[in-house]
Amino acid sequence: MPRVSIVEKSQLFLKAIVEGVPPSLVNSLRRVIISELPVMAIDTVVVVNNTSVMYDEFLAQRLGLIPLTTPLHSLPTYEECATGVADPTECGTRLVLQVTADGDVTVYSGDLTSERPDVVPVYKDIPIVKLVKGQSIVIEAYAKLGIAKDHAKWQAATASYYYYPKVIIKDEKCREICKEICPDLEDPVKCTFNKAWTCKDLCKGGLDVEWEKNKYVFWVESFGNYGVDVALKEAFRILKRKFEAFTEELVKKASSGER
C-alpha cells in the first residue's frame, strides 16, 4: 500500500518519504514535474526602442527566463492551448517594459507591466539591464503557456529522489569518524544515501549501507510560478492522463487483434 509522510513543507518546497511504489512510478513523477508542468513565460519580444548597451537578443533572452505567476485554475490546459482548442488570447498575455533613464538606473523585472494582473513576474528584483542618463528601452513582450520539454524557460519546478538508506553500524567509532559528514548516521533525511556511502568508505568495514526496496526520500522545489501543492496536483493530473491514454490504446489494439 503506497504511503507518504511529509518531512518538510513550505509554499515552494516539499520533502517527503514515499514507500510502497516502484521506482519507475517515482521517476515518472519526477520527469513530469521537471519537463511537463505548464507555466507562462515570455516567448515573443518586440523591441520598439533600445538605446542601452545590451543587444536586443540578450534582452529577449533575459525576459524569457523571468518566471511569471501562472494561475492554472483560470487558464485553459496546456493540451487545449497546444492543439488550438482554446482561444489563443486566453493562453497568453502581453507585457510592456518602458523605462527612460534620468540618471544611472537599473531596470528590474518589477518594471514589467502586464495586461493580466494574475500573470506578473514572480520576483520583482531580477535585474534586466543598466541604463545611463538619456538611454531608454521600450519593449512589448508576449507570454504564452508552455512546457519545459520545449524550452527551459517553461520549467516550473525541479524534483529528485534517492533510495531510503539503511545504515548498519558495526563499530561505534564510526559515529565519531563521520560526525562532520553525517551527525546523525541513522537519520535518512539528514544523512543521504551518498553521504552514508562516504561514511562507509571512511569507516573501513565498521559500517554497512543498504537501501530499502520501494522506499525513497522525494523532494520538489517550485520556481515560484505556483506553489508546490499546485505543481504536484498538476503532475498527477498529467500522469493520470498519460496512463489513461496508454490503457485506451492498449485495449484498442487488443480488441482489434493488432500486434
From Swiss-Prot:
Superkingdom in the source lineage: Archaea
The catalytic activity, as recorded, is:
RNA(n) + a ribonucleoside 5'-triphosphate = RNA(n+1) + diphosphate
User: Which Gene3D superfamilies does the UniProt entry name for this protein?
Assistant: 3.30.70.3110, DNA-directed RNA polymerase, insert domain, RNA polymerase, RBP11-like subunit
- Main subcellular location: cytoplasm
Keywords, comma-separated and alphabetical? Cytoplasm, DNA-directed RNA polymerase, Nucleotidyltransferase, Transcription, Transferase
Q: Cite the Pfam families for this sequence.
A: RNA_pol_A_bac, RNA_pol_L
* Location within or outside the cell: Cytoplasm
Q: Which GO terms describe its molecular function?
A: DNA binding; DNA-directed RNA polymerase activity; iron-sulfur cluster binding; protein dimerization activity
The transmembrane residues are none
One GO cellular component term of this record is: cytoplasm
- What Enzyme Commission number(s) apply to this enzyme? 2.7.7.6
For biological process, the GO terms are: DNA-templated transcription
Which HAMAP family would you find in this protein's record?
A: RNApol_arch_Rpo3
By sequence similarity, the record places it as follows: Belongs to the archaeal Rpo3/eukaryotic RPB3 RNA polymerase subunit family.
Role, per record = DNA-dependent RNA polymerase (RNAP) catalyzes the transcription of DNA into RNA using the four ribonucleoside triphosphates as substrates.
Q: Subunit details for this protein?
A: Part of the RNA polymerase complex.
Q: What is this protein called?
A: DNA-directed RNA polymerase subunit Rpo3
Q: Which organism is it from?
A: Pyrobaculum arsenaticum (strain DSM 13514 / JCM 11321 / PZ6)
